[in-house]
Amino acid sequence: MIRIAIPNKGRLYEPTISIFKDAGLPISGGAESRKLFAKTTDPDIHILFARAADIPEYVQDGAADVGITGMDLITERGANVEALLDLKFGRANLVLAVPEDSDFEKAQDLEGKKVATEFPEITRRYFEKLGVNVNVIKVSGACEMTPHVGIADAIVDISSSGTTLLINHLKAIDMAFSSTVYLIANKESLRTKEKILDIKTAFESVLNAKKKRYLMMNVPESSLKAVKEVLPGMSGPTVMKVESSKFSEESILAVHAVVDADLIFTIVNRLKKVGARDVLVVPIERIMP
């Protein structure tokens, strides 16, 4: 059996549930039902709902074989786990921020000052790398308040849009850490349970598919060479003969190809110009590596 620890609430919960569904492992019964455990469509893969901040230690200590949580939390806990895959969601930027009316312009200006944060380990590493000595003060919330009540001169805190900083009359002067959500594994479990790599492959197939689109089109045989030159495809386009029609004077071919999603606009326009018609652009659910 493989036990996977996933966030039980917060901004990481819904994207995590979605990637399981997209990977063909939908979870039956979510954390909203107040359950601690749930099942997937694979009888050997079970789900453990936990606080995102606790998941690194659950995986490190073997309470879970696999986990999904933010790299900021993994790094902060110093967990001895194997990072298997960047899942590309849940981006969190830890920024160094100071009062907007202060004279601090860069991290080096905070030599000997107090910095409040919910991420003391990441903050210490950040300032040590810069060679700046500061007094790191751990807080458990409302970090933005600390410079205004004399507890700290600056903060290191999560910021996405910067709106919270603006509301609290703070300005970001540097990026201390950038994080996304990772699939992690217990090192012993990874060595002994082959199915963990199957789970990684399933998630990887979803991520690969998000970057690609499937193109289908009809192409006159005389235009095939020009069309093939336009299509970059993963391993070249697939070409199939279309049943001839009494209304068509030229043989028609069906051409299928997988292309990068961000190239769709350019490629479709080029295909039309060299003779392709009836072009369909289809999203892809999974691409197995």
Swiss-Prot record:
NCBIfam families from the UniProt entry? hisG, HisG_C-term
Q: For this protein, what reaction is catalysed?
A: 1-(5-phospho-beta-D-ribosyl)-ATP + diphosphate = 5-phospho-alpha-D-ribose 1-diphosphate + ATP
Keywords of this entry: Amino-acid biosynthesis, ATP-binding, Cytoplasm, Glycosyltransferase, Histidine biosynthesis, Magnesium, Metal-binding, Nucleotide-binding, Transferase
Q: Which family does it belong to?
A: Belongs to the ATP phosphoribosyltransferase family. Long subfamily.
Query: Its biological function?
Result: Catalyzes the condensation of ATP and 5-phosphoribose 1-diphosphate to form N'-(5'-phosphoribosyl)-ATP (PR-ATP). Has a crucial role in the pathway because the rate of histidine biosynthesis seems to be controlled primarily by regulation of HisG enzymatic activity.
InterPro entries, per this entry? Answer: ATP-PRT_HisG_long, ATP_PRibTrfase_cat, ATP_PRibTrfase_CS, ATP_PRibTrfase_HisG, HisG_C, N-reg_PII-like_a/b, N-reg_PII/ATP_PRibTrfase_C
Tell me which EC number(s) this protein carries: 2.4.2.17
Gene Ontology CC entries for this record: cytoplasm
Q: Which gene encodes it?
A: hisG
Any one GO MF term held by the record is:
magnesium ion binding
Could you tell me what this protein is called?
A: ATP phosphoribosyltransferase
Q: Where are the disulfide bridges?
A: none
Name its cellular compartments.
Answer: Cytoplasm
Principal location class = cytoplasm
Cofactor(s) recorded in Swiss-Prot or TrEMBL? Mg(2+)
> Biological process GO terms, please?
L-histidine biosynthetic process
Uppermost EC category: transferase
**In what pathway does it function?**
Amino-acid biosynthesis; L-histidine biosynthesis; L-histidine from 5-phospho-alpha-D-ribose 1-diphosphate: step 1/9
How is activity regulated here?
Answer: Feedback inhibited by histidine.
